[in-house]
């Protein structure tokens, strides 16, 4: 259904973004790619006021399919766009967090974490509980894709305890989102899903 929507009917990519998210959670990367291929080059997610290069999501879908070459090509295209974006506006928290995810997709962990942390400094949850939670969730994703399970779990715990973060982080979402597959065997992550109130570290 989503892939059948013509690009002209989705000029800002909002429908493409929602369709991608549904396909992602249903573990249907081929459907996700079909949706993005028909959509615009820049999309907008409901939880992010700023633009997102569709190439970043395309890279995510290719990585889920195990096609590392195509994934790297897409992540690198997103990187170039986002680096230009934060050069133009160094205070763009969303731009920094999406850039961090593109670095993580390229295996550039130190740069990914640095960019993700910069985003949380620019837009902490203390300043904007809703949009700041989205930025913080992306940092958790960067951590897990960079192999840092403990910091990822600490952030997830903080978000689960927040009344303003339910739209980006819930036990139900964590259970079905493929993003977290690589840490499902981790004892702290298992405990988090069973009892999100159990202490297990401090989020940055």
Language-model features: locations:
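Alpha-helical protein-protein interaction modules
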Residues: 1-204
């Amino acid at each position: 259904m989503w892939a059948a929507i013509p690009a002209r009917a989705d000029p800002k990519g909002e429908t493409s973004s929602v369709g991608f998210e549904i396909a992602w959670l249903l573990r249907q990367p081929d459907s996700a790619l079909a949706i993005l291929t028909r959509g615009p080059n820049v999309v907008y997610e409901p939880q992010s006021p700023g633009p997102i290069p569709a190439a970043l999501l395309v890279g995510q879908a290719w990585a889920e399919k195990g096609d590392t070459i195509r994934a790297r090509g897409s992540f690198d295209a997103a990187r170039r766009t986002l680096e230009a974006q934060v050069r133009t506006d160094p205070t763009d928290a969303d731009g920094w967090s999406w850039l961090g995810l593109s670095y993580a997709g390229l295996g550039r962990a130190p740069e990914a974490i640095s960019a993700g942390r910069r985003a949380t400094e620019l837009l902490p949850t203390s300043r904007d509980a809703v949009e700041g939670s989205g930025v913080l969730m992306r940092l958790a994703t960067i951590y897990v894709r960079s192999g840092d399970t403990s910091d990822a779990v600490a952030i997830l715990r903080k978000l689960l305890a927040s009344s303003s973060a339910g739209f980006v982080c819930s036990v139900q979402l964590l259970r079905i989102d493929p993003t977290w597959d690589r840490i499902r065997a981790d004892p702290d992550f298992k405990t988090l899903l069973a009892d999100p109130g159990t202490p297990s570290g401090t989020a940055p």
